[in-house]
């Protein structure tokens, strides 16, 4: 099993940082005399902690910034990075971005969005579900009060995920998908097919829409509750301020 980070996104609501950086390299922790700690740093640290020393990173927007930091990140976290090119990062949404990584899915991955700041307990929770026959397992926040913007999930005991979408009454949801998934290698081919059907239908769809397509085709997606932990998806400067507050507590 390897780590996988989707780091191709532009993050235009985080300008001026993202004028020159992909969202995954926006500074989260800054200390005088040290290189800033980014979302990618935090994720690589988590992966290394749970023994995932091979990490694929899907790059696109400002890919050169990741290339420039690659060797230093490998040294710092003791990992080997494999960069995967998303040639449509500024045109299409992330269903295509995850599909670009279809070959590494065969190895089994923990997938992390390049804008999600979360503690290593999330990876540990997902890895603890292995051996139960689950092919795809989503990290789910069942504690947070949900609103309209969140990626909401309806999951049924014994059946797994029935719906995953932002377009849902929060009161109907089991919880929020936080942007971290364990994908076993035997799900790779079916998931890749579902992702391809998703972006071919509409290139602006999310990879979570690909998960829904996978479920609609009869595939099972399970969830793992992460407990009462602090995490944040960084979409804008308010989110970044929250990330800077909580990342120092990990």
Question: Predicted regions span which residues?
Answer:
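Conserved alpha/beta core of the MobA/IspD/sugar-nucleotide pyrophosphorylase nucleotidyltransferase superfamily
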Residues: 1-3, 174-250
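Conserved core of the sugar-phosphate nucleotidyltransferase
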Residues: 119-198
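Conserved beta-loop-beta/alpha segment of the NTase-like Rossmann-fold superfamily
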Residues: 67, 74-151, 155
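Active-site glycine-centered loops adjacent to acidic/histidine catalytic or metal-binding residues
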Residues: 9, 115, 236
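A conserved hydrophobic helix/loop-capping motif in glycosyltransferases and polysaccharide synthases
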Residues: 4-8, 27-28
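Conserved N-terminal catalytic core of the sugar/cofactor nucleotidyltransferase
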Residues: 2-5, 13-16, 32-108, 201
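A structural signal for short hydrophobic beta-strand segments in well-ordered beta-sheet cores
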Residues: 25, 153-155, 223
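Conserved beta-strand segments of alpha/beta enzyme cores
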Residues: 24, 80-82, 160, 220-222
